[in-house]
Amino acid sequence: MSRHNARDADETLRRMAEMMANGLKTKTEPFPENAIAFARILDELRALDPDDLKQKLVIGGFVDHPYGLDEQRCQECIYFLVHRKWCDLPELAVPVEPHWWCRLWKI
């Protein structure tokens, strides 16, 4: 990642954290229980402008803390790139904090 991209990612991460801290309401439910439900959420995300960060957060169901009975976190998700603090799900492709969560979480 170039220095410019790292700065962009840091700024995006800051904006995301600020939106959630300010009470952004996101769609944490329903959690997709099967591949069809998961694909529907992906379709919603694909329909967005790739730069529509707020709607990515809303549709993705992001929260800035562990979620659910098992306290799931981005850190345990298969899409989380540890060394970049990045969600590698192509429809999201955003920086994330390890302790955050979204409803596209998968192990």
Label every PLM stretch briefly.
Residues 1-107:
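Cysteine-centered metal-binding/redox modules
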